Amino acid sequence: MRFSLELSHHLWTRDRDGQAPQRTLDVARAADAADIDAIWASEDPEGWDAFAILSAIAAVTERARLGISVTSPYPRHPNSLAASVATLDRLSGGRAILGLGRGQVEWHRDALGIDIGDPLAVLGETVALLRQWWQAPHRAISPVDGCFQIRGWERVIHPVRDDVPIYLAAAGPRALDLAGATCEGVIFNAQTSTDFLRQALPRVRAAAMAAGRDPAGFSFVLQTTTAVVDTPDAERKAIDRGKNLLALVSTLPGMDRLVRTESFDVPALLDKVRATMRTRDTLAAGGGFPALRRNGDLTAARALIPDDLIRRLGIIGPLPVVREQLRTLDELGVTHVAVAPPEDATSVESWRRLLADLGQ
């Protein structure tokens, strides 16, 4: 199992002294020097430009793979995606990974005015178009009844590699099948349950084999952040962060299936949390995460969510507990897991100790 650093724009929203951009680069530089496997930058419609962030990180790192987790062909047309990935791959010396997903279609359709069509068909065609642009003769053509109607468009800037890996963010059965048949990996959202993973990973492998592909080299990336905590106060903070995440993300349409577990009545719980967070009303009005935070009551939502559910969905605890949780995920076939930065996140030695403790 390998570990990754997950970067989010949220740190920048709390930037009071203008140092957040430099700190982002410093943390990435330290993690890379400590031999972290990958650095991922999230991309939400209201946030930063993940390709710009990773291009800057490419200039201060040497080893780590650099991935988007995840972008969507709705706000980023496939031609723009092809250009951005090729540019990042060139700047990084062949280290780019594309994390691709449909995103929250309600935001694209209702707030940004984008025609979404059939999201799965859009994703499948996007993957096919990107492969055509990245491989000689670098000319892409959509199917006759395609979603984009690309008519022989040729690109002149290509990635270092013609097989840049594409990882699909997948939750539903059809998306898992598409990932296995056409991509190199799957990205599972933070707090995906082991119950879900036990069903999903074999399905992806079966889809790969059915498409004549070898699933042995497939990557399964879990975005759940590994948090080693040694005090009750540190655990409390980690659990509350997990509750916030559950209230804001797992209540969105299509996300609840990832967090279902036999130990809890998750559908009933999420219905209560949605009501407290006013999730449906906010989405219907075209609101994104800023509106969800304003309109919902996170304090009340946290009170509804059992601590033990977050412990079950997370990777939280003292080092021996975390190691056991990681061992379980490794046995399931998860290949990559996110890790919370050490307290001194700009220290190479702190990163090395953390990764060594976790077993990398």
What are these regions (language model features)?
Residues F51-T71, P75, V122, T126, ...:
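Alpha-helix-loop-beta-strand connector modules within alpha/beta enzyme cores
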Residues M1-L66, V164:
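N-terminal beta1-alpha1-beta2 module of alpha/beta enzyme domains
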Residues D35, I57, L88, L130, ...:
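Conserved, mostly hydrophobic/aromatic
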Residues F3-H9, I39-A41, L66-S69, A96-L100, ...:
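Hydrophobic faces of well-ordered beta-strands that scaffold small-molecule active sites
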Residues S4-Q22, S69-P78, V160-A171, T226-D230, ...:
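Active-site mouth loops of central-metabolism enzymes
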Residues G117-I157, L197-P202, A206-T328:
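An alpha-helical appendage that flanks or caps ligand/catalytic pockets
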Residues D17-A31, L81-S84, A170-L178, G242, ...:
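Short, acidic/polar
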Residues M1-F3, I36-A38, T61-L66, R90-I97, ...:
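Short, well-ordered coil/turn segments that N-cap beta-strands
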